[in-house]
Amino acid sequence: MKQVDIKLFDPRLKDCFPGYATPGSAGLDLRACIDERTEIHPGETLLIPSGIAIHLANPGFAAVVLPRSGLGHKHGIVLGNLVGLIDSDYQGQILVSCWNRGQTTFALEPLERIAQLVIVPVIQASFNVVNDFQHSQRGERGFGSTGKC
């Protein structure tokens, strides 16, 4: 397990410290660190503070902010940027872009779980400019060209 430095901006998080729900959980829940119930109207996007900052400090890691499946499926609440990327050298508070793609207003409660944070390995590449690629079986075919019977 990788140890990560974390800052708590909201004292309420001491009672519900971010953690993994089960031993097999890939992500830990991020909570809405808001002071009062906040409505997210259909089509609206709001930036919601998570109350935490992390510092991964190693360019071999990044964190991704992902939507919670229940909020998206049941209420239409997904991430406005689809996936949030937290670079290893970012030290500011993590903000969650919540987009209501549903057709009814959603009431977001203080400290409600709104997203998941997953830490992932990163490989930084160096690029070699070429005129042509070595031929592959797939070539330039894309957009549904694979997996056909």
UniProtKB/Swiss-Prot annotation:
Its cofactor is Mg(2+). Keywords: Hydrolase, Magnesium, Metal-binding, Nucleotide metabolism. Gene3D superfamilies: 2.70.40.10. It is an enzyme of class 3 (hydrolase). It catalyses: dUTP + H2O = dUMP + diphosphate + H(+). Pathway: Pyrimidine metabolism; dUMP biosynthesis; dUMP from dCTP (dUTP route): step 2/2. InterPro entries: dUTPase, dUTPase-like, dUTPase-like_sf, dUTPase_trimeric. Pfam families: dUTPase. Substrate binds at R68, S69, G70, N81, L85, I86, D87. One of its GO terms (biological process) is dUTP catabolic process. One of its GO terms (molecular function) is dUTP diphosphatase activity. Its EC number is 3.6.1.23. Belongs to the dUTPase family. This enzyme is involved in nucleotide metabolism: it produces dUMP, the immediate precursor of thymidine nucleotides and it decreases the intracellular concentration of dUTP so that uracil cannot be incorporated into DNA. HAMAP family: dUTPase_bact. This is Deoxyuridine 5'-triphosphate nucleotidohydrolase. It comes from Nitrosomonas eutropha (strain DSM 101675 / C91 / Nm57). The lineage of its organism: Bacteria, Pseudomonadati, Pseudomonadota, Betaproteobacteria, Nitrosomonadales.
